[in-house]
Amino acid sequence: MRRRNFLLVIFPLLLSFLAQSASASELRTWDQLQGTSPKGYVLLFRHAYAPGVGDPENFRLNDCSTQRSLSDLGRQDARDVGEWLKRRQIDILRVESSRWCRAKETAELLGLGRVKLNKNLDSLFEENDIANHPQTFQIRKQIVAHRKNSGLLIMVGHYVNIAALTGVGLASGEGVLVRANRNGELRVLGATPALGR
């Protein structure tokens, strides 16, 4: 009984310690990039919080009124992450976004420069075999090609797309930092902080 009680106490503490260690490691990567023009780094960022799942039945790409929209909290989260990145003083090569309105608005609210739309970042929520989808292939190819470029490339997209590329499941308004190695494999190097979310 004593052993069981000990485990009930120590296990949550261990999980907390491991989470803090992982978070500290991820932030160290950002510390190393501070004030630089990093070569080959890409931030895959999930759009900020937009209540709901998937897309409404009447979804139309060019009509934001038919799509899920960011909540006020989601908009503030996007601004906060943008300010956090600005304080890092990392050179931004470009900000790209899915054509979905919630992704575009997130990218714009980051406030890190003009947003370029990239159809290969569009949501694959309704698709099968996302890992082998042509859009996933094209984004992976773009990240590999970015190895030769300086400046952080920011790509704002969707949960399923990013998970297919990295194996990481992101909450709304979170991002994962990746870089391709010489073999074209994507390495996960860090993540954006929760910033109180």
Language model segments and positions:
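Short, surface-exposed amphipathic charged segments that create phosphate/polyanion-binding patches used
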Residues: 129-137
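Bacterial N-terminal signal peptides
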Residues: 9-17
